[in-house]
């Protein structure tokens, strides 16, 4: 049986991304791509809001505690610049054109401070 203590960072990240995808779809977004990669990096989740024709690039941060700071500390200006670059590369490769583009961060907290409870999700919209 896999527990939080025995999970690898990759497994923990995959669990957080799955929870984030479930949340996004429950909010009415359609998932276009997961773990899109190119030579410059990776985009965790790419979703769209069909009602507003907005494409949303989502960075997912999964934490088991506050050891590395909160969600605001997890996404630096450098990380936002990287996400913008990756989003631009993804968009350049698409035939569809979008009315708007947004970069969001979803924080997923699991683990000791959240033991026995449903994972806590925090959604920051339009960070860059």
Swiss-Prot record:
User: NCBIfam families in the record, alphabetically?
Assistant: PRK12497.1-3, PRK12497.3-1, PRK12497.3-3, YraN family protein
The entry's family comment says:
Belongs to the UPF0102 family.
> Any coiled-coil ranges, and where?
none
Cross-referenced Gene3D superfamilies, in alphabetical order? 3.40.1350.10
Q: What is this protein called?
A: UPF0102 protein MRA_2923
PANTHER family under this entry?
Answer: UPF0102 PROTEIN YRAN (PTHR34039:SF1)
InterPro entries, per the entry: Restrct_endonuc-II-like (IPR011335), tRNA_endonuc-like_dom_sf (IPR011856), UPF0102_YraN-like (IPR003509)
The record's section on Pfam families has: UPF0102 (PF02021)
Which molecular function GO terms apply here?
A: nucleic acid binding
Q: What organism, scientifically named, is this protein from? A: Mycobacterium tuberculosis (strain ATCC 25177 / H37Ra)
């Amino acid at each position: 049986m896999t527990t939080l203590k025995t999970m690898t960072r990759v497994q923990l990240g995959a669990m957080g991304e799955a929870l984030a995808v479930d949340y996004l779809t429950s909010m009415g977004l359609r998932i276009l791509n997961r773990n899109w990669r190119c030579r410059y990096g990776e985009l965790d989740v790419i979703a769209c809001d069909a009602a507003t024709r907005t494409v949303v690039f989502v960075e997912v941060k999964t934490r088991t505690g506050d050891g590395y700071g909160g969600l605001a500390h997890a996404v630096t200006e450098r990380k936002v610049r990287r996400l913008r670059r990756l989003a631009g590369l993804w968009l350049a490769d698409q035939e569809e054109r979008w009315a708007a583009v947004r970069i969001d961060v979803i924080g997923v907290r699991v683990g000791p401070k959240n033991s026995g409870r449903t994972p806590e999700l925090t959604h920051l919209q339009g960070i860059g």
